[in-house]
Swiss-Prot record:
Protein name stated in the entry: [Pyruvate dehydrogenase (acetyl-transferring)] kinase isozyme 3, mitochondrial
Family from the record: Belongs to the PDK/BCKDK protein kinase family.
Biological classification of the source: Eukaryota, Metazoa, Chordata, Craniata, Vertebrata
Function: Inhibits pyruvate dehydrogenase activity by phosphorylation of the E1 subunit PDHA1, and thereby regulates glucose metabolism and aerobic respiration. Can also phosphorylate PDHA2. Decreases glucose utilization and increases fat metabolism in response to prolonged fasting, and as adaptation to a high-fat diet. Plays a role in glucose homeostasis and in maintaining normal blood glucose levels in function of nutrient levels and under starvation. Plays a role in the generation of reactive oxygen species.
UniProt biased composition (Basic and acidic residues): 395-406
Amino acid sequence: MRLFRWLLKQPVPKQIERYSRFSPSPLSIKQFLDFGRDNACEKTSYMFLRKELPVRLANTMREVNLLPDNLLNRPSVGLVQSWYMQSFLELLEYENKSPEDPQVLDNFLQVLIKVRNRHNDVVPTMAQGVIEYKEKFGFDPFISTNIQYFLDRFYTNRISFRMLINQHTLLFGGDTNPVHPKHIGSIDPTCNVADVVKDAYETAKMLCEQYYLVAPELEVEEFNAKAPDKPIQVVYVPSHLFHMLFELFKNSMRATVELYEDRKEGYPAVKTLVTLGKEDLSIKISDLGGGVPLRKIDRLFNYMYSTAPRPSLEPTRAAPLAGFGYGLPISRLYARYFQGDLKLYSMEGVGTDAVIYLKALSSESFERLPVFNKSAWRHYKTTPEADDWSNPSSEPRDASKYKAKQ
């Protein structure tokens, strides 16, 4: 650990600087699928990953250094940096090793598993660093904007990093999932969306009943514009979709139960509409949980605005995302990762519609990856300009003082 701390304090290592000059190579779900299904070759995957993984790590490691020093000096952020440095150096050992050696391929597989496990707690640990920073230095709008920009890119990079590793380890690790034998790595070529909806609902329902002893029911409706009367299927990563749906169901259930806690005749159902068109697959989750004021919608996706109580990371440093208020922003990153999105439409006093948009075609579902370049650098260095729209004063003017003299 001392070595990594020393390295972190040095100027950008030449290898990190060199790899960060390359842009990541985004893949589509179709490319993931075609490679895993038709011509899965461990040598080819190895040769791609031994370059691509360091590129993605180096891009985000360069960007970390643009954060405010007061944030970089938080122990939790330093710990995350040490993990990234260690993983980068371990992957770099395979830069020139021959793919023709079976032992090299096996060792590389084991390194990928070790790296993935090392990064398991990146999200809560980085969140801990943000909390430490906010508690000590307070809230600054400009710095908050930069932290929001960085964390969206940092966590997206992590999602992509794990996607690449999972595909390689699942395809070449020798462990076929008996529950999902038709999956290509972590991708389901015929993902039944309604089934994932119901699985996510049941999991959220179980938690809701544990805490509140009750839970709203679920109503699901499908509309398949491409093939009427057929169940909606999509080529997708079920674990990503489950993550998004579980978070939205959890929020809808909590809002509904808390609003109608004194009601004796039951609760309004949470309604889900799944639609498939030519371009988009959309999933709308609607509740009657009272809604959210318009001014608070953006805050729900802001890492610095979290009002959740500070969770403990001991003894394993692991913590649920919801404990940091990161559930919604991370879910939106999962949706955006393959060119989709997650949006909230709320009517205060009534309820909220949450809509997940996914690409209907796997050939259009390309990874959306952050790139470290001059545009990114300028985002951190440009000072905020004065607002060019009027802002209401905290103390409105007395209009009577400005009456025209007769």
